Regions:
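An amphipathic, aromatic/His-enriched active-site/gating alpha helix that lines ligand/cofactor pockets
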Residues: 34-51, 60, 70-106, 123-124
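Short coil/turn motifs at secondary-structure junctions
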Residues: 21-23, 72-74, 110
Length: 124
């Protein structure tokens, strides 16, 4: 199997650290997916999105999640996020403790060069 970097140097991750109301984790996932997979998700229509986000659940706390995605332009992500919060107001946000759905942004500053990954894969 060919190895590929998780993300590209110079791009950005958005990292949401989400704690939902106690006992509401499964409901959160259901409502999140309803919005994320729906026709009303402007994030998926942006050319600035490189890879679609993934929602991860903490293995030790069923009400704790991380949402991570790769973007070329965090200003565009921020603009869309603010529009979604103001105009669309997805139902899943109501389940987040404190009601805040704001990520940290991280610049990707290093990645393994493809030739190194290819060499490792060839050695298998």
């Amino acid at each position: 199997m060919a190895l590929v970097p998780l993300a590209m140097k110079g791009h950005y991750f958005h990292v949401y650290d989400i704690k939902v109301k106690s006992g509401r984790g499964d409901e959160f996932v259901e409502l999140f997916n309803k919005f994320d997979y729906g026709d009303n998700n402007p994030f998926h229509r942006s050319a600035a999105q490189v890879k679609d986000g993934v929602l991860c659940r903490d293995t030790e706390d069923p009400d704790h999640f991380y949402l991570i995605g790769e973007w070329r332009d965090i200003d565009e992500h921020r603009r869309i996020r603010e529009f979604v919060a103001r105009e669309i107001r997805p139902e899943f946000v109501k389940l987040i403790e404190g009601g805040h759905f704001v990520p940290k942004y991280a610049e990707i500053v290093s990645m393994t060069p493809q030739e190194v990954l290819d060499k490792a894969a060839a050695a298998e």
